Amino acid sequence: MCVIFPVEIDVSQTVIRDCHVDEQTRELVYINKIMNTQLTKPVLMMFNISGPIRSVTRKNNDLRDRIKSKVDEQFDQLEREYSDKIDGFHDNIQYFKDEHYSVSCQNGSVLKSKFAKILKSHDYTDKKSIETYEKYCLPQLVDKHNDCYVAVCVLKPGFENGSNQVLSFEYNPIGNKVIVPFAHEINDTGLYEYDVLAYVDSVEFDGKQFEEFVQKLILPSSFNDSEKVLYYNEASKNKNMIYKALEFTTESSWVKSNKFNWKIFCNGFIYDKKSKALYVKLHNVTSTLNKNVILDMIK
């Protein structure tokens, strides 16, 4: 999940799609729809990506709904209303510029050493935001061990108008890896809020990584005395599912002996073995874990 400045900008739930294009190329769609009626100054956002960007295009807002529906459909199948049972290029940096946006992609080490200069090349000069980014964001974005690429995006006033508020990035992944950018800026509380949906195709299943993520999820607070938060690690012929859900029991209004068991707020990872596609839903949950998911590609 990228970091956005200024912080008063209101954005919708993050929606991510990362898909295979050809043997050397993937397409990342990263959507943080701006909800404010009008931008009065540029908006800065950054996120990790597993290779250099080769092109940037704007796409129609309808794409967000199509991706969201695809992910929601998978998780809706987990939830039930009734059950009989509850289970336990300057400086060698390439820039992509348009009237309403500016994008660059560079190694983390390059971004760290030339941070202010790169932002100036994007016509971004908000001193307070730059200082905050250097303190809270760069340590999370720049991995000294892997030196991941970082996409820098500046959205300019006017970007929020019209029907093409979605940016699509074609990039060349390095090391046969796909980075799903969930990481946040570092904060003083050590607790991170997630509200993101993601669809990623042509990747390997990574149960260990998904288990770590789900086990640390904190679901919304309780509203029923019989409520339980249960952890699932299930496998079927076609799917692997690792998720948490909120489950509780209610009594029938007509026959007191009848019990209704509910499963809601399913959050986690669903992997389709046949299509080799990953579906992720982290909706209004918190966690002490703050990291990206990094997956092996299937070519």
UniProtKB/Swiss-Prot annotation:
GO BP terms, alphabetized: negative regulation of apoptotic process; symbiont-mediated suppression of host apoptosis
An example Gene Ontology molecular-function term: cysteine-type endopeptidase inhibitor activity involved in apoptotic process
Keyword vocabulary terms for this entry: Apoptosis, Early protein, Host-virus interaction, Inhibition of host caspases by virus, Modulation of host cell apoptosis by virus, Protease inhibitor, Thiol protease inhibitor
Keyword Nucleus: no
Pfam families tied to this protein: P35 (PF02331)
Record-stated family: Belongs to the protease inhibitor I50 (p35) family.
Task performed by this protein: Blocks the insect or worm host cells apoptotic response initiated by the viral infection. Confers protection from cell death in mammalian cells. Acts by blocking the activity of members of the caspase family of proteases.
Protein name: Early 35 kDa protein
Species: Bombyx mori nuclear polyhedrosis virus
Gene that this polypeptide is encoded by: P35
